């Protein structure tokens, strides 16, 4: 059992992930190096834009929803979605939590 929806070939998924490995790692590094302290919503704009652009490139319609204390929530859903198809909900945060300048002492490494 692969945990994938019916009709999704796990070998094809793995091949795609391997093919895009460097692209994924580059995005991960860019996100990890982005200064976005929790209490500085303005600093979140670059990360929001990066995530929104990448989601849009994958075929998602992206909306920015006002959030009283954190600036903006990103809401993304597939532009083309089959009725009754499986859905996923991904919840996370994109602030680095630490004060500005802290990331300089935390080098990115895999």
Q: Predicted regions span which residues?
A:
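Conserved small-residue
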Residues: 35, 76, 90-93
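N-terminal capping segment at the start of a domain
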Residues: 3-42
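A non-catalytic alpha/beta surface segment that caps or lines the substrate-entry region
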Residues: 37-84
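Residues embedded in well-ordered beta-strands
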Residues: 29, 75, 87-89
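Intrinsically disordered, low-complexity coil segments
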Residues: 3-6, 80-86
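Intrinsically disordered, low-complexity segments enriched in polar/charged residues with Gly/Pro
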Residues: 3-4, 17-18, 48-52, 61-64, ...
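Active-site metal-coordination/substrate-binding segment of hydrolases
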Residues: 85-110
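Short hydrophobic/aromatic-rich motifs at helix boundaries and adjacent loops
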Residues: 1, 20-25, 46-47, 79, ...
């Amino acid at each position: 059992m692969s945990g994938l929806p019916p009709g999704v070939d796990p070998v094809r998924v793995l091949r795609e992930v391997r093919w895009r490995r460097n692209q994924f790692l580059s995005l991960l590094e860019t996100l990890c190096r982005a200064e976005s302290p929790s209490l500085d919503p303005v600093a979140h704009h670059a990360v929001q834009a990066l995530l929104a652009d990448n989601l849009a490139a994958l075929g998602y319609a992206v909306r920015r929803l006002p959030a009283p204390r954190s600036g903006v929530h990103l809401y993304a859903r597939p532009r083309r979605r089959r009725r009754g198809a499986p859905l996923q909900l991904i919840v996370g945060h994109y602030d680095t939590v630490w004060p500005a300048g802290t990331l300089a002492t935390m080098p990115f490494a895999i």
